Amino acid sequence: MMFLLPFLTVFLAKQSHTRTHSLRYFRLAISDPGPGVPEFISVGYVDSHPITTYDSVTRQKEPRAPWMAENLAPDHWERYTQLLRGWQRTFQTELRHLQRHYNHSGLHTYQRMIGCELLEDGSTTGFLQYAYDGQDFIVFDKDTLSWLAMDNVAHITKRAWEANLHELQYQKNWLEEECIAWLKRFLEYGSDALERTEHPVVRTTRKETFPGITTLFCRAHGFYPPEISMIWKKNGEEIVQEVDYGGVLPSGDGTYQMWVSVDLDPQTKDIYSCHVEHCGLQMVLEAPQESGNTLLVANTISGTIILIIVLAGVGALIWRRRSREPKEVMYQPTQVNEGSSPS
């Protein structure tokens, strides 16, 4: 198997059994929706999993995950259905006020995001912000009990909301305490789905995209959770510019996919390698020197990661442990506001 060594190197880091989790609620109001488009929508997520939904057409809060339906009684859904109907009226009124202040008519949107995160080290974060027509409008700072306004109209809202000290403290408490309590409860309800790990299948390919231009592609698919790091290196140095990234996208089967590519001169003697990190698993695949691909499949068996490498039709089984802890992988949250309990 020595002939494989120039093509790839595989590192295994000790697997971590903790990860960052988030609970987020989103609201959206639309001032002039078209036929069949709700005027108001509210959706809840744990990590990337939708858990609740409500809209102005159904006017019912409903579960989006089976483990939510199984663990929350019917009176929970009825109680928050009534609350959401009230929040719908309030949210649509706020949108009309903003349109008057901006002197706008026609189609406009108003969004709200609230949520919290439980980090790997046990610490927590909370976030609450609003957007108008997709642009940041006002953001809550729970540490200073104040609002950060993004324009002159937002300053009007800031003055009104900061006059209510009780509400400011209430939002802080919800973000720091109640939101985290609900998140922990939901993680318990959906542990089988939310705590699982599926490592990616990673493939590097080389193809001529234009005359004189060769593109290297590194593709990962079939992984969960969606947090992943993928970079290209040239002669051991990370390539920062001239790299194209595809976003982390759902595959439709509960897993995710992503790609990253880089162009090169086909006559170059430089060595290019794709570096992938996912839940403590670190993989380095050297790009093929000729048209073709390198495929790496990672599976977990009894706590030991087995890597099956298929290169040019030849299969090899390689495994190796490393005691080094994994680096932090990338994660980008978003945000919403939902009252004293999940909605």
From Swiss-Prot:
GO terms for biological process: antigen processing and presentation of exogenous antigen; antigen processing and presentation of peptide antigen via MHC class I; defense response to Gram-negative bacterium; defense response to Gram-positive bacterium; immune response; innate immune response; positive regulation of T cell mediated cytotoxicity directed against tumor cell target; T cell differentiation in thymus. 5-(2-oxopropylideneamino)-6-(D-ribitylamino)uracil binds at R27, S42, K61, R112, Y170, Q171. CDD domains: IgC1_MHC_I_alpha3 (cd07698). 7-hydroxy-6-methyl-8-(1-D-ribityl)lumazine binds at R27, S42, K61, R112, Y170, Q171. GO terms for molecular function: beta-2-microglobulin binding; T cell receptor binding. InterPro entries: Ig-like_dom, Ig-like_dom_sf, Ig-like_fold, Ig/MHC_CS, Ig_C1-set, MHC_class-I_related, MHC_I-like_Ag-recog, MHC_I-like_Ag-recog_sf. 5-(2-oxoethylideneamino)-6-(D-ribitylamino)uracil binds at R27, S42, K61, R112, Y170, Q171. Glycans are attached at N103. It is a single-pass type I membrane protein. 2-amino-4-oxopteridine-6-carbaldehyde binds at K61. Disulfide bonds join C116-C179, C218-C274. The chain crosses the membrane at residues 299-319. Residues 200-302 form the Ig-like C1-type domain. Residues 19-105 are annotated as: Alpha-1. The keyword Electron transport does not apply. Antigen-presenting molecule specialized in displaying microbial pyrimidine-based metabolites to alpha-beta T cell receptors (TCR) on innate-type mucosal-associated invariant T (MAIT) cells. In complex with B2M preferentially presents riboflavin-derived metabolites to semi-invariant TCRs on MAIT cells, guiding immune surveillance of the microbial metabolome at mucosal epithelial barriers. Heterotrimer that consists of MR1, B2M and metabolite antigen. Major classes of metabolite ligands presented by MR1 include riboflavin-related antigens, pyrimidines and ribityl lumazines, nucleobase adducts and folate derivatives. Forms reversible covalent Schiff base complexes with microbial pyrimidine-based metabolite, which serves as a molecular switch triggering complete folding, stable association with B2M and translocation of the ternary complex from endoplasmic reticulum to the plasma membrane. Alternatively, forms non-Schiff base complexes with ribityl lumazines. This is Major histocompatibility complex class I-related protein 1. It comes from Rattus norvegicus (Rat).
